[in-house]
């Protein structure tokens, strides 16, 4: 679990700048997202994230996909760590200023 986690089960953390670890998680679920959206993303850079402790960890990520376009992803990182990742949901047509919320 990342050091920025609040540690409060069920509580969603404040938004934090993306870290290399969070970018790595996003990169691992990028293909799942591309299959669901039928798009290929040349740029895929997480700019901020929030986390929620559950049976594992839910990560909410704001991703810059280029050309002024952003999307939000909801990813479950299971108890076994970074090899146990599942894209739970996503929202497209977001802007840089859209707040990252639980969805």
UniProtKB/Swiss-Prot annotation:
Protein function: This is an intracellular thiol proteinase inhibitor.
Gene encoding the protein: Csta
Gene Ontology CC, one term: cytoplasm
Site note Reactive site, residues: 10
Motif Secondary area of contact per record, residues: 52-56
Principal place of residence: cytoplasm
InterPro entries the UniProt entry points to: Cystatin_dom (IPR000010), Cystatin_sf (IPR046350), Prot_inh_cystat_CS (IPR018073), Prot_inh_stefin (IPR001713)
GO molecular function (one): protease binding
Cytoplasm recorded as keyword: yes
Cellular location(s): Cytoplasm
Residues carrying N-acetylmethionine: 1
Keyword terms of this UniProt record: Acetylation, Cytoplasm, Protease inhibitor, Thiol protease inhibitor
Domain of life from the UniProt record: Eukaryota
Gene3D superfamilies from the UniProt entry: 3.10.450.10
Gene Ontology biological-process entries: cell-cell adhesion; keratinocyte differentiation; negative regulation of proteolysis
Family listed: Belongs to the cystatin family.
Protein name, per record: Cystatin-A
Organism in which the protein naturally occurs: Rattus norvegicus (Rat)
């Amino acid at each position: 679990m990342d050091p920025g986690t609040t540690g409060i089960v069920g509580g969603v953390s404040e938004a934090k700048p993306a870290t290399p670890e969070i970018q790595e998680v996003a990169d691992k679920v990028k293909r799942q997202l591309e299959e669901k959206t039928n798009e290929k993303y040349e740029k895929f850079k997480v700019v901020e994230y929030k986390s929620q402790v559950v049976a594992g960890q839910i990560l909410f990520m704001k991703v810059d996909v280029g050309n002024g376009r952003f999307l939000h992803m909801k990813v479950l990182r299971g108890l076994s760590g970074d090899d146990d990742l599942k894209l739970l949901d996503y929202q497209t047509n977001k802007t840089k200023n859209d707040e990252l919320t639980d969805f």
